[in-house]
Design a protein with these regions (language model features):
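Oxidoreductase and adenylate-handling cofactor-binding alpha/beta cores
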Residues: 102-121, 141, 157-164, 243, ...
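A conserved regulatory-domain signal marking ACT and ACT-like small-molecule sensing domains
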Residues: 319-542
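Rossmann-like dinucleotide-binding domain for NAD(H)/NADP(H)
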Residues: 86, 90-91, 214, 223-345, ...
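An N-terminal-biased, well-structured beta-alpha scaffold segment characteristic
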Residues: 1-91, 213
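Residues in the short beta-alpha loop(s) of Rossmann-like NAD(P)-binding domains
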Residues: 11, 172, 490
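Phosphate-binding beta-alpha-beta segment of Rossmann-like dinucleotide-binding domains, i.e.
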Residues: 86, 94-142, 150, 154-161, ...
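Rossmann-like adenosine-cofactor binding region
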Residues: 52-59, 171-268
């Protein structure tokens, strides 16, 4: 059955056409919350821009929804927490609008400093007032950038080209990265005091709402100007209005407001009437090239999720560059199968998960691997949908302690993942590695060396290493028409405990497992595991 995609805001035809190649696409712009809530239950994917609000109420009605795509950067119109709780990917198109928004930032800044809108209006009125509109140049000024994401970084590059001294405030940027960009990192208060121009490039969150309030604005020079092409709520507009009216700030250029369009009586509306303020109607991403790129980018991300692949721009997952994802993908498959194995091999309530990443894999991003393991561990035990998005939250909600460890020193393998699960009854472990040209393999079960492809059905026999067990087990399986594809025994010493792994073409029924447990007095226990279908040779999300 073809996937169904609902597009609830205008989207460039390039993106729509790409979606139509593999999915049934419905375009319904300007839906109310009630209308969207009524429709959403029939769709696998939803694509919006900034106009449509995807609320918790809508998401709770989305029985089939796998992904919400935002054709742009900001996702404050989407209840990301609600989507995450239900295991719905939220993806955006961050790279598509970077250039357009950064360019618009400088368009506003230059227009503000050179008083271009006011001069143009004067000319339209038949005047030619050269001396009235003397402005300021950029070169030699200091610009303070709040937020060094994609757009903030691009603004920094443009600022350097204009001959500006660049300050920046971002808690996630290292000093080394700042030096590479040729900028100076500052705390917010210091940046506000020193900058001639302050420009905002952070998302609107609980932490950033009214980040620039009355206190923060009071730190700025009276000759300074403010530019905001991010989100209106980041700036306290009442405080901004007062600062501008009282001459404590020279001017502001705004592409975003708290109320869009401005509502009468609000600070948003009053700001539009000030002579030292320039306002554009949220045009940062409104370049034809940017819209086409955003449509294509979000369409590709949505299709990646629908075909079971891993999106690279999910906002409710750690961002993973494409090259890193390519390197991690086989280990993600391995981690997911290891979790799936321990979910069935362990008995009792899971209390703790310990993941040890050793060798080369220890130098890479671990969170996607941990998410993959938790997905495999919980998806067969829980009634709700478990995926990469909600697996950590589901583990936390159940009080499962997750511990990650890294060991960079070499092991017997280039990279090794060791997973240990502790329940209220027992502790079990499994280790896995990825081999070039072969793929993922389990290499240890409870410390016993094995070499098992984590695919299909497996019967695990815990035993004392004695003669005759393989024959008894093989005979019983044959008598019950269970074909053995592969068999291996892992042991530490002759005559000691051992584990036998038997890969079978079809699962054994419960009554046969019971017979196997009593087939020999040296058999300690018998358990069965469904690893899942064969792994793809490349690509695809576990």
């Amino acid at each position: 059955m073809r996937h169904r995609v609902l597009i609830a805001d205008p989207l460039e035809e390039t993106g729509t056409a790409l979606l139509r190649e593999v999915a049934e696409v419905t375009v319904r712009p300007k839906l109310s919350e009630e209308e969207l809530a009524q429709l959403i239950g029939d769709y696998d994917a939803l694509i919006v821009r900034s106009g449509t609000k995807v609320t918790r109420r809508v998401i709770e009605r989305a029985a089939r929804l796998k992904v919400i795509g935002r054709a742009g950067i900001g996702v404050d119109n989407i209840d990301v927490d609600a989507a995450t709780e239900r295991g719905i990917f939220v993806v955006n198109a961050p790279s598509a609008v970077t250039t357009a928004t950064a360019e618009h930032t400088f368009a506003l800044l230059l227009a503000l400093l050179r008083k271009i809108p006011q001069a143009w209006q004067s000319v339209r009125e038949g005047k030619w007032e050269r001396t009235k509109f003397v402005g300021n140049q950029l070169q030699g000024k200091t610009i303070g950038i709040i937020g060094l994401g994609r757009i903030g970084t691009q603004v920094a590059r443009y600022a350097k080209a204009f001959g500006l001294r660049v300050l920046a405030c971002d808690p996630f940027i290292t000093e080394e990265r700042a030096r590479q960009l040729g900028i100076e990192l500052r705390e917010l208060d210091d940046l506000l005091r020193d900058a001639d121009i302050v420009t905002v490039h952070v998302p609107l969150t609980k932490e950033t709402r009214h980040l620039l309030d009355a206190r923060a604005l009071s730190l700025m020079k009276p000759t300074a100007v403010l530019v905001n092409t991010a989100r209106g709520g980041v700036v306290d507009e009442e405080a901004l209005y007062e600062a501008l009216v009282q001459g404590r700030l020279a001017g502001a250029a705004l592409d975003v407001l708290e109320h869009e369009p401005p509502k009468e009586g609000t600070a948003s509306a009053r700001l539009t009437q000030l002579p030292n303020v320039i306002v554009t109607p949220h045009l940062g991403a409104s370049a034809k090239e940017a819209q086409e790129e955003a449509a294509m980018e979000v369409a590709k991300q949505v299709l990646a999720v629908l075909r079971g692949d891993f999106p690279t721009t999910a906002v409710n997952l750690p961002a993973i560059p494409a090259d890193v994802l390519h390197a991690l993908r086989p280990f993600m498959h391995l981690a997911e199968r290891m979790g799936r194995f321990l979910s069935q091999f362990c008995q009792g309530r899971v209390g703790e998960v310990r993941l040890n990443y050793a060798g080369q894999i220890a130098e890479m991003e671990a969170e996607p691997l941990t998410r993959a393991f938790l997905k495999g561990l919980m998806e067969m035990r829980l009634p709700e949908t478990v995926n990469f998005v909600n697996a950590p939250a589901l583990a936390r909600a159940r009080g499962i302690r997750v511990v990650e460890e890294r060991h960079l020193q070499p092991t017997d393998y280039a990279s090794l993942i060791v997973a240990t699960v502790r329940t209220h009854l027992e502790e079990r472990s499994v280790a896995g590695a990825v081999f070039q040209g072969v793929g993922p393999r389990l290499v240890q079960i409870d410390g016993y060396r094995v070499d098992v492809a984590p695919e299909g059905h497996a019967i695990l026999v815990e035993q004392i290493d004695r003669p005759g067990i393989i024959g008894r087990v093989g005979t019983l399986l044959g008598q019950n028409n269970i074909n053995i594809a592969f068999m291996q025994v892992g042991r530490k010493e002759v005559g000691g405990k051992a584990v036998m792994v038997i890969m079978v073409d079809t699962p054994a029924p419960p009554e046969l497992l019971a017979q196997l447990r009593t087939a020999h007095d040296a058999i300690l226990d018998v358990r069965q595991v469904d690893f899942g279908p064969p792994l793809p040779l490349s690509g695809g999300m576990p």
